[in-house]
């Protein structure tokens, strides 16, 4: 069992990583006998895990209700959020309730925002079931729902009480979802840890076949890196923005193509290549390192080009709604070398559009 602490003073919390955690009531601390819980999951995961998690909590004396939501990025919306509020109010659940997010990034983000908003804030626990949510979205307290004009535009910073990562969940993960998660894994190597990127080049095949020790190390290292960044910059005033490598481009793809048509990790993968190409054009990133990124993404089964039906010009309106934009100026996370990156403003639209166009045609 691995345990990592996200250090935020009185709001610090543990990330527990191991196989078989759904069998142990102690995995779901700080829950205790007599507590009231609303388990939030989706219709795909409910048949796989709902009874198991509900059962282990009930054996610990926890009172459990549940709400099952439709599955997919398009349902990360205010309308579906209201479904959670309605379920909480009908019981009713008070301020002493705990929301448990049992699912991937959509469930985690939506449930976290529900917890931040319901009666001005209740406790919640992240139980991520996808690789992407285990290494990224469940850690750090970013919660949100989408708006038709932009991804994650309505949300709050709100930290969980704990994160429970059961490695056994990956056994039921479709190959496309596994690849999507690997995009965020690769991101950490590009922006923060050159040694980890090199390790990924040597161990990607083991991750693709769900080798236990390799996957445990991979998730632990990603969570360590994320925890360090969040502890230093919880509200994304500086360092934490680096975690958005590829996301400004990727969110544009998701919004333009329709939420769910491109998985988040797929869009981020293409976006990271666009960011690398932009940095190349500015003379601050090598072509050789761009090719290393492209090669690793391809081995993971991820796209390295944007959708052909989306013109370069179609990106800009979405990118200019990005949360990093200041005074109307586009700010991008750009790699400087494998393991090193920066947030840069003042990049001309012409340079960005040229990089996008080349990535569309490559």
Curated annotation (Swiss-Prot):
Protein name from the UniProt record: 3-dehydroquinate synthase
One GO cellular component term: cytoplasm
Subcellular location: Cytoplasm
Co-factor(s): Co(2+); Zn(2+); NAD(+)
Function: Catalyzes the conversion of 3-deoxy-D-arabino-heptulosonate 7-phosphate (DAHP) to dehydroquinate (DHQ).
Keyword Cell division in record: no
Pfam families: DHQ_synthase, DHQS_C
Biological or metabolic pathway of the protein: Metabolic intermediate biosynthesis; chorismate biosynthesis; chorismate from D-erythrose 4-phosphate and phosphoenolpyruvate: step 2/7
Domain of life, per lineage: Bacteria
Reactions accelerated catalytically: 7-phospho-2-dehydro-3-deoxy-D-arabino-heptonate = 3-dehydroquinate + phosphate
Family membership: Belongs to the sugar phosphate cyclases superfamily. Dehydroquinate synthase family.
Organism: Salmonella arizonae (strain ATCC BAA-731 / CDC346-86 / RSK2980)
Record's keyword annotation contains NAD: yes
InterPro entries: Dehydroquinate_synthase, DHQ_synth_AroB, DHQ_synth_fam, DHQS/DOIS_N, DHQS_C
